[in-house]
Amino acid sequence: GDYYFTSKSGYFYRISVNADGTFDKDSLRWIKLENSKGSDLTMSTSTPTVYNGRAYVGVSGSEQFGAYSGHGIAVLDLKTMSIAYVVPTQGYPQTSGVLTRAYEKETGKVYVYFFDNYTPGKLRVISDEPGQTEATDLEQETDKGNTYDVGTVLFTPSDAQAQYALCNPIVDEYGTLYFRNDSNHMMALGATISKLEVTKQPKKTSYKEGEKFDPSGMQVIATYTN
């Protein structure tokens, strides 16, 4: 099979492993990474998140701990071994992203979540599909009078929870996302219900005192904030 990794010198690598566990050195391929400002003076410490011919890694800007200096989430096309595009971020996403296919059948897209390793440690999400060549759903952030187009922020820690975030997001079967950062807090981020709508009444709607509610036949639609 193929294995993928990055280097602090700013390269993304792919290599095949033989059945006996040795590397197929002739299969080695690489991409010289670029940051969100188009500079190849970048580095990456991400373990790549790989799915459906695409890879997702964090890349640094010109200053490792300088805000909006070119940090970003690089989306790579593994068929052409090239950079598809880079989504700008405030801080350097130094660890791995987590990918969900939950909406792929519905929208054709996957969603990938990364943390900025820069206070307050924002959690960002990008959407992507094969053939996509530019970022979508960007939003604007302002810092010291300058405005930047950056990847969508899903959550921003505040007060005592705001800190650098050098962690991989972890998600359970219910969609709750777990993470920790340098504030020494372990946090769980879950969706909240904004609306409940009863679309079909239960079969039994009349009860005597002491009877238990029977929901048979009842249908309810829950709308989540995300």
Protein language model regions, located:
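Extracytoplasmic/lumenal domain signature
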Residues: G1-T192
